[in-house]
């Protein structure tokens, strides 16, 4: 509704230093993406999304961050599935190249020209445990396995909406619960991390760089006021935080209040009537036909 303006303004306030193009950046005309880039105080990245008119990347392929005398290269990579997930009306002059092939070429350029101390892939490709991606385009695990060992020090990913936590044996904890101790996946010398979806967690990874080597010291998925239902002694139930409550930031609230009010006004407009529930649960609608799917298909005919 608001072309991600409040999202980007909030990301500016939080100090984001980079973001990667995902499939939803191509739901709208590219002019919207241009406008979003202007709003942002940080670069939009993707090394494998090509503007076929110019033959160049649509946005910056990578950025270099300088932290405590370290050169940190951050490379953006986007799922090839965007070609079928994005709005075809806006993809005429856009090509999505193979992320692995592009990563190899980009790393070669970085290693020769920049010589970074740390190399990070910021991806929107998805996490598919043991590279079992099914009908989806290959994700982060496939990427690491098809590159040289440790080609990237770490991958910070998205797209599949997963909390990446593995146990001591390296097995993915599918039913991860907030505050449960865990560590990121480690594939072919590369740490793979993802902090679930929709701001439910803040992902934190602490690394130590010493004598040219990077070592993971700590990894956390910090729940943002997520609650669980507990039964009290009197038999009644209540919802309590999994972890210490994170207080609302008054400056952020002030920044976003007008956008919230505008969104509420748009969402409160009556557009029709329902006689029953529209089934949109992800675990159902992505695997079988539902009345919501039928409604959307009819609307698009």
Cite the ranges covered by each PLM segment.
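Non-catalytic terminal accessory segments
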Residues: 1, 224-301
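Acidic, metal/ion-coordinating pockets
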Residues: 1-225, 287, 292-299
């Amino acid at each position: 509704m608001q072309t991600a303006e409040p999202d980007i303004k909030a990301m500016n306030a939080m100090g984001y230093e980079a973001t990667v193009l995902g499939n939803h950046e191509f739901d709208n005309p590219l002019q919207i993406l241009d406008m979003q880039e202007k709003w942002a105080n940080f670069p939009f990245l993707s090394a494998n999304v090509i503007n076929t008119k110019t033959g160049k990347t649509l946005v910056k392929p990578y950025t270099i961050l300088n932290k405590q005398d370290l050169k940190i290269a951050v490379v953006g990579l986007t799922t090839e599935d965007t070609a079928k997930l994005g709005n075809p009306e806006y993809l005429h002059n856009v090509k999505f190249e193979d992320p692995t092939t592009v990563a190899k070429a980009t790393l070669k350029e970085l290693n020769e020209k920049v010589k970074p101390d740390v190399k990070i892939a910021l991806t929107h490709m998805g996490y598919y445990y043991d590279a079992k991606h099914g009908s989806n385009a290959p994700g982060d695990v496939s990427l690491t396995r098809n590159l040289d060992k440790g080609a990237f020090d770490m991958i910070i990913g998205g797209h599949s909406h997963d909390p990446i936590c593995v146990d001591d044996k390296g097995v993915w904890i599918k039913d991860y619960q907030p505050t449960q101790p865990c560590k990121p996946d480690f594939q072919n010398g590369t740490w793979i991390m993802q902090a679930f979806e929709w701001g439910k967690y803040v992902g934190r990874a602490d690394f130590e760089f010493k004598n040219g080597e990077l070592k993971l010291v700590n990894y956390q998925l910090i729940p943002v006021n997520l609650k669980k239902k507990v039964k009290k002694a009197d038999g009644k139930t209540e919802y309590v935080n999994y972890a210490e409550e994170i207080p609302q930031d008054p400056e952020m609230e002030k920044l976003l209040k007008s956008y919230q009010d505008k969104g509420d006004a748009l969402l409160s407009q009556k557009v029709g009537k329902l006689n029953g529930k529209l089934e949109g649960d992800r675990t159902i609608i992505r695997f079988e036909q539902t009345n919501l799917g039928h409604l959307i298909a009819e609307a698009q005919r």
